[in-house]
Amino acid sequence: MVGTTSGSTPAGGQTDRVQSNPSPTDRSRPVPPQLLPRTAEADGDGTLLIGGCNVLDLAEEFGTPLFVYDEAHLRERCREAMAAFDGRVAYASKAFLCRAMARLVHEEGMTIDVATGGEYRVARAAEVPAASLVMHGNNKSGAELELAMRDGVGRIVVDSFDELDRLEALVADGAPAPAVLIRINPGIEVHTLDEVATGVPDSKFGFPLADGDAAGALARAAASPAMELMGIHVHIGSQVFSAENFADALAMLGPIVGEWDLPEFVVGGGLGVPYVTGEEAPTITQWANGIHRACDEAGIRATVSAEPGRSIAAAAAITLYRVGTIKEIAGVRTYVAVDGGMSDNPRPVLYGSGYETFLPRAVAAERPRTVTLVGKHCESGDKLVVDGAVPADLAVGDVIATPVTGAYGHSMGSNYNKVLRPPVVFVADGQARLVVRRETMDDLLATDVG
């Protein structure tokens, strides 16, 4: 087997970078098995199989770019999370959402965290009950709130005093009173990028703890007949590897959680995952054990739940591309251009995120050649993998892959340069099913009414 279970041992130290490319000593080695989906293996010819499906055959059948998700991997991560938090888990759908994904996590017993009316409608279109949804967002519109309230949404996570005003106005107009959580910003620094740190003092999310806004929001919600205050919510950031960061936040929140003695306490998500050679992260189980221990130490007696997203979906998928050009610039670098790019994975452009790359036709091959994998967009920064490693015989026409693209790739995709967004397939037991089709030119023009 090429694949392994998700995660490795917890990292000892952390850097401010979320990801980094592998060191020169590691670059020539085969792609690390722990970065591949759970069921990944090589067939007799050395070609990558996922879910029993030959990925080169998938590229021929569905075209490239193509997201390939290992359904067994997704379900295994869901089950690990549910066991670690005693069945109290909401999947953070911003990581990756389509109707098939919503159905899958619902089948595994999870509720679903949605942050916009669009995410809400996709989950409902998958026949997920409104009571199994948690409505997030720092700027929910009146229309979004009203739809969720009239449907009977499970929880609304309140993010501002303006939102409290909206809830009270909607209930006064006849909407049913919702059950709410108050999102508190603990104001701590975490080891991640500024763009994904959500619990720092300077953040658009939540009620600040330090200035008394959090206490004021709790008091107002508790006194309001327009809502039922169920608990407190916190989220410190994304791609966080350090268990100490979570423990620090829980220690800061212990007094206010204890003072209010509410039944629910949600720790959010944010657990980091490895993207490149040499990175390590806690497993979901290890993370949960640390959360429970920190809650005990902070005197938090409420029922604890979590909202993982990246740790469920990221390593479950790879993206397949086809090589279109290879441009060697003597003394500078070799550019390998593919038929996708920043429109299907904007994370390298947004965050400087590192990724690996490999050839599925030779998944266990050494990778002695250094290249920079770039997309087809009109941006010099459209780089998917900088100084990546590939086999020496890479050629135009090859199918090339990047692993760990199951979270914040498809969900953050765009039509930049009017590129069509790629399809998504789920694979299991030797069968591939199309769950998101490739966009067409008709789709591209459908909203262009000028």
Model-derived segments and spans:
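A charged N-terminal "starter" segment
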Residues: 1-179, 223-229, 430-450
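Active-site loop/helix belt of alpha/beta enzymes
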Residues: 2-7, 11-30, 187-327, 390, ...
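Charged (often Lys/Glu-rich) extended helix/loop segments that serve as interaction or gating elements
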Residues: 3, 301-450
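General structural feature for long, well-ordered alpha-helical segments within catalytic domains
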Residues: 54, 58, 70-73, 77, ...
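Structural signal for hydrophobic packing residues in well-ordered secondary-structure cores
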Residues: 62, 78, 82-85, 109, ...
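Active-site beta-loop-alpha junctions enriched in small/polar residues
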Residues: 73, 94-98, 115-119, 138-140, ...
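Structural preference for beta-strand elements that scaffold enzyme active sites
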Residues: 88-90, 109-111, 130-134, 155, ...
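Short acidic, glycine/serine/threonine-rich loops at helix termini
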Residues: 102, 125, 145-150, 167-170, ...
